[in-house]
UniProtKB/Swiss-Prot annotation:
This is Ubiquinone biosynthesis protein COQ4 homolog, mitochondrial. The lineage of its organism: Eukaryota, Viridiplantae, Streptophyta, Embryophyta, Tracheophyta. Pathway: Cofactor biosynthesis; ubiquinone biosynthesis. InterPro entries: Coq4, Coq4_euk. The keyword Disulfide bond does not apply.
Length: 226
């Protein structure tokens, strides 16, 4: 399997070294998705183990673990052909308007087992689906807000570190807007919605976007205050 072949076994000391190096590198250049991904993997094992156990207790979660769907062009390309009101079409519009490709995510390399590697891969690949569901942009405020939701859902240390790093890079207006409007919303939204790692999104692409939001308890992001 591709996920298994991509894995790099690390000792505890090596994990610590990769985590520290990734954290420092990500602070210097927050655009380095590979460093942020490595940080998430080397610090996130306990969190991914908890997510895995929750998925095993959920009907859709078990189906995901059994079938191992991937959010890649080959498997989700049909979303571009769905009616405008659907969740799948909204995802396609989100991706297309930004010239994003589902295939751009870096591979998981530092998880100990194939099963955990898949869970980490799934968490990484549904990121843009969550952007779509919550109506969040990909600017600094949008990404920081989604990291808060991801932390509430998965308790990944990397998510909280990313939020802290994001607030440091905010200008005064952005920081005020985030702390006053987006942070409280993101905490509430992340806690109120269903367990999003146990949702088999691909099975719901053809459903109405607003209906799936209601079904999963999604609170869309606040609009930018005037």
């Amino acid at each position: 399997m591709i996920i298994e072949r991509a894995r790099v076994p690390l000792s505890r000391w090596q994990q610590a070294a990769v985590a520290m190096g990734s954290a420092l590198g990500a602070l210097v250049d927050p655009r380095r998705a590979d460093l942020i991904a490595a940080l998430g993997e080397t610090t996130g094992k306990p969190a991914f183990e908890m997510v895995l156990e929750r998925m095993k207790k959920s009907e859709e979660g078990r189906a995901i673990l059994l079938e191992r769907p991937r959010v890649v062009s080959e498997q989700v390309g049909h979303a571009w052909d769905l009616p405008e009101n659907t969740f799948g079409a909204a995802y396609a519009k989100f991706m297309g308007s930004r010239n994003f490709s589902p295939d751009d995510r870096p591979p998981v390399r530092f998880m100990e087992t194939d099963e955990l590697a898949y869970v980490a891969t799934r968490a990484r690949e549904v990121h843009d689906l969550w952007h779509t569901l919550f109506g969040l942009p990909t600017n600094l405020i949008g990404e920081s807000s989604l990291k808060v939701i991801e932390f509430e859902q998965m308790y990944l240390p990397m998510c909280m570190l990313s939020v802290i790093g994001g607030t440091v890079r905010f200008n005064e207006k952005q920081r005020s807007m985030f702390l006053k409007h987006y942070l409280p919303w993101a905490v509430r939204a992340g806690r109120q919605c269903t367990d999003l790692m146990c949702v088999y999104y691909e099975r719901h692409f053809s459903e109405d976007l607003e209906q799936v939001r209601r079904k999963w308890g999604i609170i869309p992001a606040p609009q930018h205050p005037k």
